């Protein structure tokens, strides 16, 4: 059976979910396994958010550039950024 493809989540939704994860982790009430799972999900959300911000910054720079024909190119984040 094929996996469901996830719908793209907005930056704001990801940030909201990340804030909830941080609150749960800071409470100190999660069992270790749950805390590790939450942490892993939080890292994924943070990386996705950083990628979206970098893509938005690239678009703004192109829009503000003097070259009206400057192409948008796909962004590939470095794994060392977080």
UniProtKB/Swiss-Prot annotation:
Record keywords, A-Z: Cytoplasm, Exonuclease, Hydrolase, Nuclease
Quaternary data: Heterooligomer composed of large and small subunits.
Pfam families: Exonuc_VII_S (PF02609)
Residue ranges that the Swiss-Prot or TrEMBL entry lists as coiled coil: none
Top enzyme class: hydrolase
Subcellular location: Cytoplasm
Protein name: Exodeoxyribonuclease 7 small subunit
Task performed by this protein: Bidirectionally degrades single-stranded DNA into large acid-insoluble oligonucleotides, which are then degraded further into small acid-soluble oligonucleotides.
GO CC field: cytosol; exodeoxyribonuclease VII complex
GO molecular function: exodeoxyribonuclease VII activity
InterPro entries per the UniProt record, alphabetical: Exonuc_VII_S, Exonuc_VII_ssu_sf
Keyword Nuclease: yes
Annotated family: Belongs to the XseB family.
SUPFAM superfamilies per the UniProt record, alphabetical: XseB-like
Gene (name only): xseB
Listed NCBIfam families: PRK00977.1-1, PRK00977.1-4, xseB
Catalytic activity: Exonucleolytic cleavage in either 5'- to 3'- or 3'- to 5'-direction to yield nucleoside 5'-phosphates
UniProt GO BP: DNA catabolic process
Superkingdom, natural source: Bacteria
EC number of this enzyme: 3.1.11.6
């Amino acid at each position: 059976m094929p996996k469901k493809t996830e719908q793209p989540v907005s930056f704001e939704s990801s940030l909201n979910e990340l804030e909830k994860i941080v609150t749960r982790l800071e409470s100190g009430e999660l069992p270790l396994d749950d805390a590790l799972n939450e942490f892993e999900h939080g890292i994924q959300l943070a990386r996705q958010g950083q990628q979206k911000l970098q893509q938005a910054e690239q678009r703004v720079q192109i829009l503000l550039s003097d070259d009206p024909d400057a192409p948008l190119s796909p962004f590939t984040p470095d794994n060392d950024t977080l």
